[in-house]
C-alpha cells in the first residue's frame, strides 16, 4: 500500500467499544453487530460470540476484552472498517474497560430501557469522557413490557448530560434498530488521527500466550506501519524482536500484509518470555524508534489479598506458572511466595475485588487443573509504630505486636449506591452496620436515589455486594473507588485449635465487634471441624486474652463392650487406660482443617 491509499483507508476506519452496566445487553448487541455486518458465517454464530472463555459464557458476564474487525457497507455506498472492542461491565474489571477505551475513538453507551442508568454505567461513562471519546447513546430492550424509553432518554440527559434526542431505540435480541446504530457509528465516531509515515507507535492493550507461537500481543497502531520481518523494540523493557506475523481478528485470527494507522490487530514475534510483552507498553521500530512512548494505563493496584495454596504441595511450581500466565494479560494481578504452618508453601495473591478473586481461582482450577485452598481475603492496613516508623500489613498473621503499635489505619472507599427510594432505609441500615459514614443523597428522578457512603474497604470486600442485593431485592447497583486511609480501632484476632494458633485463620476486626465475631466463629468452627478421638478446644483470642471458647467433643470408643457384667475394677482399669491414651494423643495429635473452615471466617454476617 502506498501512503495515499493508507490515508484513504484511514478515513474509513471507525474504532469503538460498547459500554454498559452488567446485564444491559452488551454482548447480545455485539453479536447483532457481527451478524449484520456479515462478518461471521451464520453457522458459526452463537450467543455471546466474543466471550470466548467458558467461565464467561457460564456466568453470562464478560471478563476479558476482545477485539474484532468488521466491514460495513453504509448507506452512502462506502465500505467502512469497524473495530469493535468488547469491554466487561463489572466493577472489578474496570481496568479492562479503561484498556479497551484507550484503543478507541468512540463508544456506544447501552442503557436498559426498563432499568435506566445504573452505577456502573456512570463509572464507565466517566472513563470514556476521560479518554475524550464520542458517546452514542442506545436505549436497548425496548421490546420489554416494562420498557420506558422516554423516561430513560430524559434520565440520560439529566444524569449524564448527554443529548439523547437522537438516541437509537433498539432491541438487540429482536434485531431492532441495529442498522441505525451502525449508521450512527459511521457519522459520529471520528476516524483515527495519526501519521502512517511517522515512526511506529503501537499500544499493546492485551496479550495471550500460545505454546507454539509464544506471546501474541493485541495492538492498536497509533502512528506508522508494521509488517512481518520488521525489527521491533518494546519501549518499556528495551527488548528487541523480529515480527513473525501481523494480522487481524475476524473473530478468528487472520494474517495480513501490514497493519497501519488506526488498525487493531495482533502481532507475534517469537517472544518467549511472558514479561517482555507488557500490557500498556509501546511497540516501535528498532531502527527508527519513536521519541517517546504512548501514555500507558494507570496501574490498577490490588485491593484484596489472600493466600492461595495448592492442595497437593508438589504442585507449587505449577501454581507459580499458572499465576505467571494469568498475569500476562491481567496486569493487576500481583503475587509473592509465602509459607504457612497450617498449609505449607503457596502464594500471597493480590486482586481487585472479590469477583476477580473468585474468577482467578476458578481459572487456575479449570485451565491448569490445580486444586486450591484459599485463605480469607484481607486488605492492606498501615500501622504507625510507637517508634515513629510505618509498617504495611497485607496478611493478618504478620500484624506487629499490639504493644508497639501507636495507630492503625485502614483503607476507605467511597461507595455510590443507586436504589429505588423504597429501599433507602434498608441500604442505610446495611451501611451503618458495615461502619459506613453517610455523605450525601441525591434524587435522580422521582423513584431513584443515589446514596454515597464512606465505608471501610474490609467491610465491602467480604459480602457487602451480596447483602446489598438481598436487602434491596436485587434493585440496587453499586460502584466504589478508593479514597484513602483513616484511623480505626482495629485488633488482630487469632483462632487457637488445641491450644495452637492457626496462622491461616487469623483476621483483623474492629474492636467493637471483636467479641461477637469471636463467638460466632468459634461456634461455626465447632460444626465444621471433624470430631477427633480426643477433645479439641477451639478458642478466639486477642493478644493473650481468650474472648470465646468452645470444645469439639471427642468420639468415644466403647472400651467396655467386651466386658460381660462382672468386676468393676476391671472396667475401671480399661477406662483409666483409655483416658491415659487420649491424654497422650491430645498432646501430640494434630487437627485437620477443612477448606470450609477458612471460608467461615468470611461469611460471618449470615447468622
From Swiss-Prot:
One of its GO terms (cellular component) is plasma membrane. Gene3D superfamilies: 3.30.70.240, Elongation factor 4, C-terminal domain (3.30.70.2570), Elongation Factor G (Translational Gtpase), domain 3 (3.30.70.870), P-loop containing nucleotide triphosphate hydrolases (3.40.50.300), Translation factors (2.40.30.10). Keywords: Cell membrane, GTP-binding, Hydrolase, Membrane, Nucleotide-binding, Protein biosynthesis. Its main location: membrane. CDD domains: EF4_II, EF4_III, LepA, lepA_C. It is an enzyme of class 3 (hydrolase). GTP binds at residues 23-28, 140-143. GO terms for molecular function: GTP binding; GTPase activity; ribosome binding; translation elongation factor activity. Pfam families: EFG_C, EFG_III, GTP_EFTU, GTP_EFTU_D2, LepA_C. GO terms for biological process: positive regulation of translation. It is a peripheral membrane protein. InterPro entries: EF-4 (IPR006297), EFG_II (IPR041095), EFG_III/V (IPR035647), EFG_V-like (IPR000640), EFTu-like_2 (IPR004161), G_TR_CS (IPR031157), LepA_C_sf (IPR038363), LepA_CTD (IPR013842). HAMAP family: LepA. This is Elongation factor 4. The lineage of its organism: Bacteria, Bacillati, Bacillota, Bacilli, Bacillales. The gene is lepA.
